[in-house]
């Protein structure tokens, strides 16, 4: 059934919004995996877990905001399968943060591509929506993750030969306590 409210909303933009919803849901799913991995009793980095669980919530809310936009414009939400996270065991905080940063850069590129498509299709409402709700937030999150990675690399220092304890454990613990503390 065709929407009676649809105006200046191309099918290409509609499809791209649906793909972006899926990317947000996949990011949320991945952040849930990360959050609960770091909160396990054998990992016990609650601040890191909390950081990733908050991101899971933000990405889910971002997906819902896109779905509301789709309905407001007369588009149709077409749900796709959400791909499971690439792994179940995430290793050290630095490795997890690197994976999260790569995912955010991919998400940011998808937002930029959608903005460019909106500009090409002369859809100022879409461009304003993305600028108001996503683009600046995404850049700030990428910067924050980059800062966290810099600090994680700094506290990890040079990796000596294995001495029985996992490498970088003290630095990882200090990063979690001093940077991501919550409570």
Swiss-Prot record:
BP term (GO), one: intracellular iron ion homeostasis
Record's protein name: Ferritin light chain 1
Keyword annotations from UniProtKB, A to Z: Cytoplasm, Cytoplasmic vesicle, Iron, Iron storage, Lysosome, Metal-binding
GO CC terms of this entry: autolysosome; autophagosome; endocytic vesicle lumen; extracellular region; ferritin complex
Single GO MF descriptor: ferric iron binding
Similarity comment: family membership: Belongs to the ferritin family.
Matching PANTHER family: FERRITIN, FERRITIN LIGHT CHAIN
Bilayer-spanning residue ranges: none
Subunit architecture: Oligomer of 24 subunits. There are two types of subunits: L (light) chain and H (heavy) chain. The major chain can be light or heavy, depending on the species and tissue type. The functional molecule forms a roughly spherical shell with a diameter of 12 nm and contains a central cavity into which the insoluble mineral iron core is deposited. Interacts with NCOA4.
Subcellular location: Cytoplasm; Cytoplasmic vesicle, Autophagosome; Autolysosome
Keyword Ligase: no
Main location: cytoplasm
Listed InterPro entries: Ferritin, Ferritin-like, Ferritin-like_diiron, Ferritin-like_SF, Ferritin_CS, Ferritin_DPS_dom
Ferritin-like diiron domain segment(s): 7-156
Role according to the record: Stores iron in a soluble, non-toxic, readily available form. Important for iron homeostasis. Iron is taken up in the ferrous form and deposited as ferric hydroxides after oxidation. Also plays a role in delivery of iron to cells. Mediates iron uptake in capsule cells of the developing kidney. Degraded to release iron upon autophagy activation by nutrient starvation.
Binding site for Fe cation: 54, 57-58, 61, 64
């Amino acid at each position: 059934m065709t929407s009676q409210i649809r105006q200046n909303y191309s099918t290409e933009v509609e499809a791209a919004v649906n793909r972006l919803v899926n990317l947000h849901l996949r990011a949320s799913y991945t952040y849930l995996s990360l959050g609960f991995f770091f909160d396990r009793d054998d990992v016990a980095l609650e601040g890191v877990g909390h950081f990733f669980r908050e991101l899971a919530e933000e990405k889910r809310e971002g997906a819902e905001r896109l779905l509301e936009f789709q309905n407001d414009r007369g588009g149709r939400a077409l749900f796709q399968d959400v791909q499971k996270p690439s792994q179940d065991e995430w290793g050290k905080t630095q490795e997890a943060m690197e994976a999260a940063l790569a995912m955010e850069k991919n998400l940011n590129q998808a937002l930029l591509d959608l903005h460019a498509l909106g500009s090409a299709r002369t859809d100022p409402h879409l461009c304003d929506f993305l600028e108001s709700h996503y683009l600046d937030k995404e850049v700030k999150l990428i910067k924050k993750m980059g800062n966290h990675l810099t600090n994680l690399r700094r506290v990890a220092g040079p990796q000596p030969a294995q001495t029985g304890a996992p490498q970088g454990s003290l630095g990882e613990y200090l990063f979690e306590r001093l940077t991501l503390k919550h409570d």
